[in-house]
Amino acid sequence: MVKKILGQCYIWLILILMYLPILVLIVFSFTEATNVGTWTGFSWNLYPRLFQDAQIMTALGNTLILAFVSAAVSTVLGTLGAIGAFYSKKRTRKAIDSVTQIPIVNAEIVMALSLTVMFVFLSTYVFKAQLLSFWTLLIGHVVLSLPFVYISVKPKLEQMDPSLYEAAIDLGATPRQALTKVILPETLPGIFSGFLLAITLSLDDFIVTRFTRGAGLLSGDSQIETLSTLVQAKIKKGPIPVEMRALTTIIFLIVVLAVVLISIRRHYVDKKHAQGRVRG
């Protein structure tokens, strides 16, 4: 009984430590106080002010475009890489798995510096032109996210019967049909998880963005600004803009809504599969 109570207390303590700062931020998004901790009265004004701030809206647009494009590219490459490794020889598969683990455990600053050195070398000795741009930033985010997509898809492939592909080919399907009709549907939950994880990594990233960014995508500025780099730049000059509290609240609520919808859909799919097994 005592162990059960202590276990529940420990779980609640972890949850409080995780979500209390977010709840404080949400509460103070409804006041115009400059400093968190000083309540100057309830107000919605931060939310309309957020959408009137051109600098924040540009950074938000850059961040979302970068996140979704890099996630899409990472998902395609990571999924194809996982499928290719799954159907490779055992030694080749182990080698690919090991290589894929390195960027995950490696320090992000090492990856960022390596990409920067590579882009500078190519700019100086190969293309003879400035390369740092939105495209180099996109490459950096794809390199950052791709291994996580790979490890999200890989378990779903391992749960699948490896003979399904050969069976589809034997029944007259082309390799492309076997991939799209058999392999991809079986791995779709892992692909979707990898896609969401890639979006999260891109939205959250600062180090790779700081080292590989170039000209702005939406504003044409000398350097593209994302939310992470904008916050860092604002901190150097003074306090974080109060409108950021409203923005982070909106992002958090969208994430919560997405998680709830995904959980409902997963419950519905699992229930449907269970009913199908009972009928079978």
State where each predicted segment sits:
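C-terminal transmembrane helix and the adjacent membrane-cytosol boundary/short C-terminal tail
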Residues: M1-Y10, L17-L20, K154-Y165, I169, ...
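Transmembrane-helix boundary motif in ABC transporter permease subunits
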Residues: K3-K4, F68-T100, V120-F121, L179, ...
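Interhelical loop and adjacent transmembrane-helix boundary motif
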Residues: L46-Q55, L203-I264
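Periplasmic/extracellular loop-to-transmembrane helix junction in inner-membrane transport proteins
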Residues: K3, T34-S70, A233-P241
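Membrane-interfacial helix termini and adjacent extracytoplasmic/periplasmic loops
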Residues: N35-G37, W44, I109-V143, R176, ...
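Short membrane-interfacial helix/loop motifs at transmembrane-helix boundaries
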Residues: L20-A54, R213-S222, V278-G280
